[in-house]
Amino acid sequence: ASTFEVGRMDPPMVDKDAQLFKSPFTVTVSIPSGATLRYTTDGSTPTLNNGQTSTTGIFDVSSTVTYRFRLIKEGTLPSAVVTRSYLYKDRDIVLPVISVVTDPINLYDDSLGIYVRGVNGRTGNGQRTPCNWNMDWDRPVNFEYLTTDGEMVINQEVDMAMCGGWSRAWTPHSFKLKAEKIYEGKNFYDYPVFKTKPYLKHKTFQIRNGGNDNGSRIKDAALQEIVRTSGIYVDGQAYQPAVHYINGNYVGLLNIREPNNKHFAYANYGYDS
């Protein structure tokens, strides 16, 4: 006889949000009766065949780690994955923090990865040989945003795609984080990252490396702010500098920007398409 799953497990409850830390601490994750808690620390999705099992739900944290937790129970669909980035504060950080966590294959695999030159891309943007980062591929990632006070205000499954022109070849790479309804039924971010603008709903953030200004990374943002605040009836893309981690690895300073597309019109003026 065939067996069908009925319903879906609720996501595991994690008692600590993503955070920067200096002192060791303990994280506790709920394990309902009859369920198995599976987890990974490499960014990949926990399944019965991938990751490790915890029987206690207790995790001691003393160094940077990115956990992905999932509950599995026979006869029930596995829960959604819950992600937490615990980042050891080994440097002074006075800016917001972006943490992106995903299966390394999505970024670094030669055939499928969007963050590498790879072997499955196309030429262009100053590159004579094919490059994966030139492709307009979407890859699923978890996106966490921590404020300057260390509060986790965004933790969301989203799509990541590369962006830019010639600067696609420069590291760290520029990319987009796109909220999509297929993840949790939510195609927007509900936190006002840009304090300089009235907040409606942002559907996409561009995470930019500064383009030609890859030293200070503020030239374009500064010019847009000058124009935006000059009294001239011309709008500009809002700007928020942030430090960036990928799978717990420190990348550096990048800029969060509004996109210059239909999502800009939606976020600023409510025009949807």
Predicted feature locations:
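Short, compositionally stereotyped local motifs that mark structural "simplifiers"
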Residues: 1-140, 145-159, 181-182
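Conserved ATP-binding subdomain of kinase catalytic cores across diverse folds
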Residues: 100, 121-273
